[in-house]
């Protein structure tokens, strides 16, 4: 498959990712005066067992993005169809004047029969995707960027609702030019993957 820069610009890349509360190494530096060891201002409350996690889904193109969807519970094929593909993917792909190819990986909910039938029924063209190849997808860089922005926040989320709200805000704040830059790297990604015979690349 020989995709040009324009071809890649007409692909919607999508994926799920999981973010954790208290995902740092757990160390916090506190500056205090003598005798203030147990002062409320000098005590950092820890979340046990990592504090839980939030799974999200998102899709990006060179021109726009879907809303970031927070997934509650386990994502089944039926939920993927009804909660993600129908409300978020179809409206963007089927918008007038658009000719968008849809990309998702080979996770079990993505390749289930009910999903394949739904995509075929709605004339959604999907991009064939090799197994176990996250370094090929530009949306992986979006997740990395979101993690960096999350860690830089002065007030770190301590509950799952706070984490969900922070992730949605971060997703919305990423400039579209950044998303386009990641997608425009696809030709280089594929070239490096071929040169590495399918092995690891710099991405």
Question: What are the roles of these predicted feature ranges?
Answer:
Residues 1-203:
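Surface/interface recognition patches
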